[in-house]
Amino acid sequence: MNETQDKIDLLDMNRLPEHVAIIMDGNGRWARQRALMRSDGHVEGVNSVNRITRFSSDLGIKYLTLYAFSTENWKRPQAEVDALMHLIGWTIRKETPDLVKNNVKIHLLGEIDRLPESVRRDLEDGRAATAHCTGLNLNICLSYSSRWELTNAARKIAERVKAGTLLPSDISEETIASELSTAEIPDPDLLIRTGGEQRISNFLLWQCAYSELFFTPVLWPDFDNDAFLEALIGYQSRERRFGMTSDQVSSNNTEHSSGCDSKSE
């Protein structure tokens, strides 16, 4: 039995995170360690995207959100930005048939209008081609930042107040959440960052309020199924309390388990 299967056997398949978000960091360092161009690291990173997307789908994870290109990434050298834009469009065109085959549905988050027209067209074609899929929801964050998202949500809420359709006293957490680009997506249960840095870099700040955080030194191009399983095993080893005590969580879990047992009898 290989190492991957050994790790799969350690998982409780009934307690997998519904939603996993990943900050894919380390492409540039991976390339530098091999005396390659940064663009080579990004190309290799695409292989990891394909690998983890397929594996997430196979495991039955419902939502996978990938931080592919941040608002801040526009500040990178123009040659690198151009290479990334080309790679994004090429990857979507190439991988869409396999996504359809594997029942994976594409969602796009971020300021998509800022992307080059050809890339937008490729992305929209991919989204349209997978619109009927009912398996894994693949959320691709492009030209995205959480501060942009929250500012945009605040602006929309202010417009509703100005129009008289919303009272300031009626603004709630649900009101804000409904104006985010993730309005129809559950909050991440697990946020993974590869590459060794331990920060969340303006990514899903609102949505990750109660997410479990997993930081790994593994560079994104090297992030394979075994590394992903280690993150999932780490997630399942934690107690998610959401402000409650351990005793309360234990009691709720026992009641839920008893209820499930009763229904199955």
Predicted regions span which residues?
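Flexible, compositionally biased loop and terminal segments
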Residues: 1-265
